[in-house]
Swiss-Prot record:
Transmembrane segments: none annotated. Pfam families: UPF0223 (PF05256). This is UPF0223 protein SAG0995. Belongs to the UPF0223 family. It comes from the Bacteria.
Length: 93
């Protein structure tokens, strides 16, 4: 069972602005699973996230850690948003 109290996969070398961008993206992913979210909002936060997390390897590591603790996949959320292209998405369980 996934705990509702989980930690976010953050890099201690990130500055406050970087942490804010990463947390915003992870929060948008949470909204996609728990409610619904505008595709543009999720993709915009993903673009900002990618300015901080440039390597695919680090992105995959963050996705794995976040999915392990929260049950939410950043990869699946972005994939769904890219396929939808506009409007809203909801990945609720």
């Amino acid at each position: 069972m996934i705990s509702s109290n989980y930690s976010y996969p953050l890099d201690p070398s990130w500055n406050t602005e970087d942490i804010t961008k990463v947390l915003r993206f992870l929060n948008q992913v949470e909204h996609a699973y728990e409610n619904s979210i505008k595709v543009d909002d999720l993709l915009d936060s993903y673009k900002e996230f990618k300015k901080v997390v440039k390597s695919k390897a680090q992105e995959k590591q963050i996705d794995r850690e976040f999915q392990r603790t929260s049950g939410y996949s950043t990869y699946q959320a972005v994939k769904a948003a890219q396929q939808q292209a506009k409007g809203f998405i909801s990945l609720g369980r």
